[in-house]
């Protein structure tokens, strides 16, 4: 009962806040003479034709966003881990490269970085728009992920390395079997925040005419004059993505914690 009451209270608060938001939006729309057309929104998600269901513009954009985010996330984690290890290394050159990369990326806007990659570096190295978007997102989010992982590495006691070495483990297996599980457990919540940021930042690549969820939403609005319905739908889809990711992270954190405690 002690656990159920806070959950019910939180659900009640969420329902009340949602009801208040709906009332405010409806009142504002009526004051402007706006006519809601929610019945048209499903046609831009799925449509039925020739006996089959087909993905409409919003669903097509969502699939592009998911593809873009998934590939960018892979490179983000690889780049973040590599940079974190470089900043922890004994090599002066390695530390300088890692520090310089993080400093440059974190102190310049993502939009400017996208323009530089798209208009300057992309044509030089022959990248298409999608690859440029993946590179821009991975470079940007990788710098922040590197700091998260570096903080996690700093929190692992030096004795863990020494104990693994005394058991005869190589450097690779020391990191893979001893350090990495602890690093994941320590950094999973902040890493989830970085993943959520990656999903949200993926909307910025719409400036490159990539047909992601945001671009498709903008195109639909220009064709239908339904700004409220479409943008609220787009926002709801992004919210569903980020909340699902947060829930998955909480489940993984619980499983990893239980597994670590059992050992």
Give the label of every model feature segment.
Residues 1-263:
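Transmembrane alpha-helices and adjacent helix-loop boundaries
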